[in-house]
Each structure stands twice: as structure tokens, then as C-alpha cells.
């Protein structure tokens, strides 16, 4: 750690744990050392994806950080043979390791690296396969000739620290010159094969070809076996059947530029503006309960869109310190109010229903015709529990436990259908990526689908694309007049491209995603009512 300049902030003795049983038995924990490291990210927008870019006009290079021979001791390969091994790889030259790391960082900064993946458990062959798994098509043609050593097994399975990087042909000479000048060893190892779904590997006279989809099935099997112990109602099997059949699809409005300027927004607004108490400024209040945890992302999304944002705790409403009379929009954020002890949002709803001042403030707010409201995740559950979306329905909607009976957290696809929502109507026809994180997100909708103002649907009817089993694949609904919206996914956590698990590569320079438009629409509507 001293040699490479890494501080050790703390330590935990995990090698002496024992478990005592009433009958006197004592189990000593196996010797285990876990080392976790973290590093500064100076620009979250300048990151490299581990997913291979399917472009034949690119090259893959292997950079070994270890300056050591390939060794199989302690590797996943050795363990798969029931062995451990004593000949393990190490970092022989700490300064060389630092030089390699710094060189890769500089190439990322210069925009030369299209994709990259570390070499760790499973070795080089696992790295190459994992770079292809997330793609629906395409493969790799690999030649190990330039990697030092005579043992192809060691080349493929040794876990010496290193990386594989993908470089466009237009930058390959710059990359080679840069690495050579900095005395960094590298080996060209292959190119993508966009038309063939295989990993082809050659090393001299030795050749092998692997079916990527078959390898992915093997790679995924352990996850399936664990999932089977956690998920109910056969959802683990559903996930195993569907995880390769539900690709993320993106479709934006034709006039979407991805710039803040398109919406008249300024990311540096906070540097130049001061709080404005003028009555003509749109004001939004974020209402929180004990356990709410999504208020900061929501506050920033609203503020960026032009709102002045107010933080309101339930105690403010219960005591009468806050009446919502000067607020144009209220937002109920995600989280786990009251730790979900009474069920999702049940306790939060009770705080409104059984505290006269809080109930009066809410009733008066919803009685006005110049207001908007938004509920996300736990806030969506609250709005449905309080029957704020469709009070005219004879049969009430409910949010129930996910069909899998477990907490679901994933990045998936939504389609925005035609709707009259203030926030979402302009996004009709879009297909967008978004995060979900909930345990009780299944919409039970007892009325016919056309009785609901549906503002968002999961792209796929089957699990896991529909993560909770919601009726009609519904992810969000709105009041009949379009003013009050409740949805389970977190649009406030997806307003920037760097927040999304996947965003179209050709749009990587976008400043914002289409989700920001929903907040801008809300602000414009409020302004029209002032």
C-alpha cells in the first residue's frame, strides 16, 4: 500500500471469528481477508463501459499490470479442479503497476478507449466473455500470439492483474505510441466479429471456438440457483428464461437534443441565483416522513427544472407549521417510510388521515385547481393508499407485494403511451431507461385498463422486464385531469446519462436525458396558472 500510495483508513480483524453453540461446540471461521478499495472519479461523465462495441474497425489490447509470469495458484480455474495451488501471481514492480494505472486513466481522459474490463476471477477468457454477454449479437476473434508465455491455459486463466481495452482504429497508432513512450507493455489480442456470435481464440496451432450464448448460460447458472432460493412463484425460472430476451430499447422525441439549452436550463443556477420569495416563482414542496431517502435527487431535479424547492417534514404538517398554501406542487419521494413496518406507506398514510392539521392541509391542496402532485415509489404507494389518483372509481387500486415476493432493484425499460398527463404527455411514444427499487410495486387495478390514465408501461409483460407483475404492465398512473401522477420507477434518478446503467453510445455527450422534460413540463404548467 505504501509503494502505490494507497491509504489504509481502517481495519477489521476478521480472522478470529468463532461461533459458540449451547452444546459446547465451537466453530472457528475460515481464514478470510477481504480488501476493498476506492478511488476518486474526477468526472462521472467520462467513464468506460465494460461492454464490447460491435465495430470491426476497432482493436483489443491486453495490458498486464503485474510484471510477473502467469500463475494459476488461487485462481478460479484451480478451484474448479478442486485445488488451491501455491504459485500465485503478484505485483512485482509497484511503480510499474502505478504507471499502468495512470496510463489507462490518461487514455480514458483523451477519449481513446471505447470499452475496458479488468482481469480478475476467471482470467482473460472470462473477461473476454463478459465483454460480449450484454450484447444481443456479435462476438470476438482473439489471437494470443503476442502475449508472452507458452502455456495457453495460463494465458487464458491466470488472474494476474491487468485490463483489456478496446480502441478505435483511428486512435490505435496514438495508443501504441503513448504506451511505448511510457514503457508500458501491451499486446494486441483481437478484433470484434459483429456478424458471428462466437468467441474464437487462437494461439499458434491451437484453436478453439466458444458459443457466447451457451457460455452465458453456464456463467448465469450460479445466479439462477441462488435466485431460486430467494424468489417465489417460479420467478427465478422466469428470469432465467427471459434475461436474454428483453433488450433495452431507447426511443426519444425527434426534436430532443440532450442539451440544457433546449429547455432554457442552467446547471450553474445555484452559483448565480438567490432564493426568490416572489409569489410568481413556481414552488415545489418535497414532503418527507421518517425513512424517506430519495429527497435529494428529487430536490435537484426540481431545482434544475426551475422550481424553488421546499423541504417539508410530516411534523411540519401535523403541527400546522406548514399549510401548503403557498406551494404549487408537492412531491412524495421514495424510501421506506416508518421502515415499512405497517406495510409500504400505510403508516405514512395514517399520519395524514389521523392528524387533523395534516389532513386539512392535504385536502385543501387537492381541492385547488392550480396544483400538481407527484409520488415516486414509496410516494406512489402513499398516493394510491390515500386514493388521490382515482377517487371516482368504485373499486380502488392497490399496490401489492411483487410477485417474486422479494425486493426488486434493476434498470429496465418503460414505454410512455399516449396520455394527457401534465408531466408526461409530451413524452408519449418514448422508450426510456429507468431504475426501480421496491418490494411492493405490483399495481392491482380492478377496473378495465381504459379506465386508467396510464402514463408509463414496462416494455415487457414477462418478469423481469415487468419486475413486479403489475396489471396491464403498468408502471405509473395519473388522475383523469392529468395533474396528479403516481409511478413506481425513479425518474429523478435517471435525468442524467451517467445515472443510467445503459444509454445510447451515440448520445454519450448528452447533458440530460428526456426525463428532465417531465419536470420542465410541470414548471411550465405552474407558470401558466400563476
Regions found by a protein language model. Name each.
Residues 7, 13-157, 169-283, 291:
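Intein/HINT protein-splicing elements and their conserved insertion hotspots or analogous self-processing inserts
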Residues 164-168:
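Short hydrophobic/aromatic beta-strand micro-patches
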Residues 42-43, 67-70, 172, 291-294, ...:
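Short, acidic Gly/Pro/Ser/Thr-rich loop/turn segments
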Residues 5-7, 185, 370-372, 483:
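Proline-centered loop/turn at the N-terminus of a beta-strand
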